[in-house]
Amino acid sequence: MMPDMIKDPFARLGLDREVLTVSQLNGRARVLLEDVFSSIWVEGEISNLSRPASGHVYFTLKDSGAQVRCALFRQSAARVRQALKDGLQVKVRGKVSLFEGRGDYQLILDTVEPAGDGALRLAFDALKAKLSDEGLFSAERKVALPLHPQRIGIISSPTGAVIRDIISVFRRRAPRVELTLIPTAVQGREAINQIVRALKLADSRGFDALILARGGGSLEDLWCFNEEAVARAIDACVTPIVSAVGHETDVSISDFVADVRAPTPSAAAELLAPDSSDLHRRVDNLHRRLVSRMQDRLMRERLRLEGISRRLRHPGERLRQQSQRLDDLDMRLRRALEQTMHQRQLRLAHMQSRLAAQHPGRTLAFLRQRLDALAERLPRAIREQIKARKLQLQSQVQTLNVVSPLATLGRGYSILLDERGHAIRNAAQTQTGQRLTARLGEGELHVRVEDNHLTPVTLSLLD
């Protein structure tokens, strides 16, 4: 399956050389973009800001070399504390999507933050420096995670995707591990005291390890995990703590103080759930111990049999029977051992197959090929676009030269202008003795009207 996907990357999109409509193409392109760029941070300057009556916010995010359209829908816009305006430098988070009606790709945003050092960022850096100087981040204070924890406490919100993701990982990898949720708020001022109390309670319950978890959000949303009280409560815990706050790009003070930092709540669960490699090692150890004990048992029985045979004057038929019985037992033991090993190998192969099926390498290989293909096509498309623009510009310059009034003047014609610079199109617009300016292809003449009949006007050069 993997070689086929590498050979034909479009198979994953279900194209298979079929002819698509424009709507189908845009729809599939949107799915691909949203899958690959599901959550990214981008920094740039706001321009063309628009706030329609719907409550949504639209603007263009640009830098010195490029720009991209952005959409901040009403629900997300209501959470933005910063007043947005043209020229504001911001950091935004969202997913890349495609507006199918126009075929234009855009960013669908959920977070907008001012770029640069804001008040929260300065407070973060100050507390980080203070706690670091006190040694709260030092490796000597870290406690190693248990290899096979049986009881784990989870400090998080009782609702939302975070707790569901953690439970899902343990059900899949370690269903026998006992999980206990210590519910707490994970956002707002009241969350600080609740998290501190939850940490103290969990540390007193004798858990093998603790997970402090929250989903992603803005710096302000995650701020309770950057409070000094929470940091010191984590440091005071005897139980090993895994901090899993926000997305992989989010970093909080609790990450530095905790014994281990996980990029996501799901990753924290995987750190504490036994993996297949550990199970493999255990099976190998059991196999070696079983083989060693069976060999020892066989050796003892052979030695015992040899001792008995030496003590007997006429072993005869009894020895042959015992030897045959021993051979039979040896064969049965070998068959039982082989069957046990075969079953263990089948089980191990099945677990390895399941693990390989979930490996991200396949998706990464496809995306890497797709990225290489796009990288090859991009320079060629840019060159073709520049060439087309140059041809269009040359054509427009030629057209302008043809219709330019300067070209007409260059062929010997002139334009008469009155004192206000207005062009004279009719003799009735002039008066006898009126001073006019005649603009030629090169330079101009100052003239005076001698006669203003509808017949050709008689002019004389002024001294």
UniProtKB/Swiss-Prot annotation:
GO process annotations (BP): DNA catabolic process
SS bonds (residue pairs): none
Gene Ontology molecular function, alphabetical: exodeoxyribonuclease VII activity; nucleic acid binding
InterPro entries: Exonuc_VII_L (IPR003753), Exonuc_VII_lsu_C (IPR020579), OB-fold_nuc-bd_dom (IPR025824)
Record keywords, A-Z: Cytoplasm, Exonuclease, Hydrolase, Nuclease
Enzyme Commission identifier(s): 3.1.11.6
One matching Pfam family: tRNA_anti_2
Biological role stated in the UniProt entry: Bidirectionally degrades single-stranded DNA into large acid-insoluble oligonucleotides, which are then degraded further into small acid-soluble oligonucleotides.
Name used for this protein in its record: Exodeoxyribonuclease 7 large subunit
